[in-house]
Amino acid sequence: ISLGLVGSEMCIRDRYNYSRESNPTRAYLEEIISNLEGAVDTVACSSGMAAISLVLELFSSGDHLICSNDLYGGSTRLFTLQQNKGLKFSYVDTTNLKSFKQYIRPQTKAVFIETPSNPTMQISDLKKISALCQAHKLLLIVDNTFLSPYFQNPLLLGADIVIHSATKFLSGHNDIIAGSISTGDHKLAKRIREVSKTVGNSLSPLDCYLLIRGIKTLAIRQKSQQENALKISNWLNRHPRVSKVYYPGLIEHPGYEIK
């Protein structure tokens, strides 16, 4: 049996017509993360790096991004790769707003920050940086992997996009690779989802299910991990063979007072 459809009829689809674009398990996971981050929409991705790659697709050749000078190595490698395609990146100390401002140019479109940063745990003041970004009409993109929504909600502090390597704290069970992108802006959410449908880096239904399972214990895991990390950091801080401890929970850490 054959069926002829005109173009407009072909565009009428069920929400779950094509699993790569969406499926019930993935939609439920995205709703959960959106609720945790205070977002209007979330896109679940196949990894944290896939999430960052997807966000970079929002920009065009010649666009300039300002980035933390202390970043996960995989992110800097990806940015180096993107330079071959025409994107420009400047790495700055995002804990110093005075030096930060001088890197803004007419081609600057966004700021990409990890806070705490990987690996030296630098803390950037998201409220102040978001105010600066808004004044210059720049997107603020925050990798929230290290703190998770349990400890920090960048969207509520003025960020436009929040990224997670959900492989880590969100999942917590060391048995999946996953990522996510959340935003509080409806127009931006539509752009991100359209890119996601096109590039096809979505998370599989099984991995979505496993991530949902992991998020159920996020609060109790994060509370215990923070308590243990503080005890270990204090012990190391007193150890005669340890010269420096990078942990923002220590009172002498330069970012300790930032909330």
Where are these regions (language model features)?
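Single conserved hydrophobic/aromatic residue that forms the stacking wall/gate
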Residues: I1-G7, C11-I12
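A structural motif shared across PLP-dependent enzymes of the aminotransferase-like
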Residues: S8-E9, Y18-E30
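Glycine-/proline-rich flexible loop or hinge segments
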Residues: R13-N17, D63
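Short, conserved beta-strand segments within well-ordered enzyme catalytic domains
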Residues: N17-S19, V43-A44
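Walker A/P-loop NTP-binding active-site region of P-loop NTPases
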Residues: A39
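Conserved PLP-enzyme active-site core in the AAT-like
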Residues: T42-R241, Y246, I251-E252, E257
